[in-house]
Regions:
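Hydrophobic helical membrane-anchoring modules
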Residues: 22, 181, 188, 195-256
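Glycine-rich, basic loop-to-helix element that forms the pyrophosphate-binding segment
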Residues: 90-106
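Short aromatic/hydrophobic "clamp" motif used to bind/position activated sugar donors
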Residues: 111
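A conserved acidic beta->alpha catalytic loop
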Residues: 63-72
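Conserved donor-nucleotide/metal-binding helix-loop-beta segment in metal-dependent transferases, i.e.
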Residues: 123-142
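Short beta-strand-to-loop element that shapes/binds the nucleotide-sugar donor at the catalytic cleft/hinge
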Residues: 141-153
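Short, well-formed alpha-helical segments that are part of the catalytic scaffolds
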Residues: 38-52
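Cell-envelope/extracellular polymer assembly enzymes that use nucleotide-activated donors
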Residues: 29-31, 58, 189
Length: 256
């Protein structure tokens, strides 16, 4: 049984944790998904930008068990935009599960995925990410930080396959390892699937965009602990998918 069969699309979704959520049955073309965990002070900026992009049919924020009012800030930032849906998970499930939950809750054939803590994001960045996929020039785009913060620029230069800024055809998610995609392994599972299946992947430079270095938003040693957890989940995903062998040769070829 495929993962998608577990949650009928366009119907009531009961995430692990028991909070009922619903997205209306409709025929959207492009949905933006923003997984968020305790992102007050950051999520509002991202939602505000997305509300300025008319090409988006749905804006889905997954409040992944936040305790700081993340979902409420997203609602306030939307200024009543009817495209916004908040999926609230009662306990933190991790980034991968949050993204998969949103995927199950939308009928859109194209997905835009963005991190909740992006800084200096502009509407034109979003349009540059979605255009190659919507026009059939690429199966997936990946957004890489460029001339924003030297630390995050360096991170994306060294490990571009870990970026959380992507647009892709939704049906491609049927081909990723759902087990490997849990937590912070989601991007790794997606990267491996792209390499193994020969997807056309196009890089998009997000000039001026960055996010806080990994340990700063959470603060102190707690943030360092989260960073260690993130990299352990990424490593686990690589081991489970054996994707590291094909990374340099196959994954990020230019769309032609």
């Amino acid at each position: 049984m495929s993962y998608r069969n577990e949650y009928p699309r366009g119907k009531e979704l009961l995430p692990m944790g028991g909070i009922s959520t619903r997205i209306p049955i409709m025929a959207p073309r492009l949905a933006a998904i923003v997984p968020a965990y305790n992102e007050v002070g950051r999520i509002g900026q991202v939602v505000d930008v997305l509300c300025q992009v008319d090409e988006l049919d749905e804006l889905i924020v997954v409040d992944d068990g936040s305790t700081d009012g993340t979902g409420d800030e997203a609602i306030q930032a939307s200024c009543g935009d009817p495209r916004l849906h908040i999926l609230r998970l009662s306990v933190n499930q991790g980034k991968g599960q949050a993204l998969l939950t949103a995927w199950e809750a939308t009928q859109a054939p194209f997905l835009l995925m963005l991190d909740a803590d992006l800084m200096h994001l502009k509407p034109y960045h979003v349009r540059e990410l979605i255009e190659p996929v919507l026009t059939g020039k690429a199966d997936m785009t990946i957004g890489l930080f460029y001339r924003g913060d030297w630390r995050t620029d360096l991170s994306h230069w060294a490990t571009p396959w870990l970026t959380g800024q992507r647009c892709l055809r939704a049906e491609l998610l049927n081909r990723i390892s759902k087990e490997a995609a849990q937590g912070y392994g989601f991007e790794t599972a997606l990267t491996v699937a792209a390499g193994k299946n020969g997807w056309r992947v196009q890089r998009v430079a997000l000039k001026g965009v960055s996010h806080p270095p990994g340990h700063l938003p959470r603060g102190g040693w707690h943030g360092v602990g989260l960073k260690i957890k993130m990299y352990s989940e990424i490593y686990k995903a690589w081991v489970m998918t054996s994707g590291w062998q094909d990374l340099a040769r196959r994954t990020f070829r230019r769309a032609g």
